[in-house]
Amino acid sequence: MDDNLYRQRAAEHALRHVESGMTIGLGTGSTATFMLYGLAARLADGRLQRVTGVPTSEVTAALARELGIPLTTLDRQPHLDLALDGADEIDPQLRLIKGLGGAMLREKIVAASAARFVVMAAVSKCVERLGERSPLPVEVVAFGLPLCARRLKALGGAPALRRDRSGAPFVTDEGNLILDCNFGIIADPEALAASICAIPGVVAHGLFLGMASLAVIAGPDGIVELHAPSARQ
């Protein structure tokens, strides 16, 4: 079955965690797009009321406005009830790789601002160890690009500058560049995250560690909810 159908099913199921009156983080990417359409439908028919969103990208903000989803900012609402977003890889501890959509900095800020962070994904995004399938995106300031690339290579990565469809360097909403780094299997995500953060010029990386409360996974056998280790009984 098509991964898009699983993404849609995961997004629809995740919306069960949204309650009227909530302020929620709105993710970026293909799964988040399904969530936005589902949220808009629930607001339109009255199943949900007074839900306000904080978008994680300009793309998400534009679509939310088009769909009639009320928006706010973290300046006005610094504490969110819930954040909903997709992921590029999810391991059994709900550690994530995110950022292939180019919005990881805002995504991480929004997720950290939420009381609960619910991840939505097709079962194909589940891995035993991070790095099995996805490169690790690292957002860097343009001035620091040469240094960041050298330091990331020294850490064992193979950094490649992300480019847009025209072949020009991809520029994030914050005006930064992204190095997609192939580290292979990441044996110690926490140690790697700390090492990357110590590189001058790094703005953000795609390792989301200890942030997800719940993962909603859709596959051929239906929907599964995976709870973070700290939330398990």
From Swiss-Prot:
InterPro entries: NagB/RpiA_transferase-like (IPR037171), Ribose-5P_isomerase (IPR050262), Ribose5P_isomerase_typA_subgr (IPR020672), Ribose5P_isomerase_type_A (IPR004788). Substrate binds at residues 28-31, 85-88, 98-101, 125. Pathway: Carbohydrate degradation; pentose phosphate pathway; D-ribose 5-phosphate from D-ribulose 5-phosphate (non-oxidative stage): step 1/1. The keyword Nuclease does not apply. It comes from the Bacteria. Keywords: Isomerase. The keyword Isomerase applies. Its EC number is 5.3.1.6. GO terms for biological process: pentose-phosphate shunt, non-oxidative branch. Pfam families: Rib_5-P_isom_A. It is an enzyme of class 5 (isomerase). One of its GO terms (molecular function) is ribose-5-phosphate isomerase activity. The active site is at 107 (proton acceptor). It catalyses: aldehydo-D-ribose 5-phosphate = D-ribulose 5-phosphate. Disulfide bonds: none annotated. Catalyzes the reversible conversion of ribose-5-phosphate to ribulose 5-phosphate. Homodimer. Belongs to the ribose 5-phosphate isomerase family. This is Ribose-5-phosphate isomerase A. It comes from Roseiflexus sp. (strain RS-1). The gene is rpiA.
